[in-house]
Amino acid sequence: MTPEAPPATPALRILVVEDELMIRMLLEDMLGELGYTVAAAAANMNEALEAAKNADFDLAILDVNLNGEPVSPVADALVARGVPFVFATGYGEHGLPEPYRDRPTLKKPFQLEGLERMLNSAIKG
């Protein structure tokens, strides 16, 4: 009799909050390539808040601005749930909401290695 292989580690489920369709699609593809599952994707504040409060996911990637609105309410909801998150921004750290400037930040445009590094940083806390 051969021993059974240990069960595969389930892929972490990611919430993607990004208002630009092409960037959102790129993120979803990159996450799949890294072995993650996209649990939900949101393109505007209402979708993002609904997902942040109710969806089942392990980690989130937040665009700093959703159609010109700061993403702070979504970050607040994630903090309330104890869910780690990474910001994605083209503005640099100065564009981050003040209370969240210590969070991992993925600078746009990003590459696969940078995405993986930031997600690992967020997961480890």
List PLM regions with ranges.
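Acidic, metal-coordinating helix/loop segments flanking the phosphotransfer/catalytic sites
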Residues: 41-59
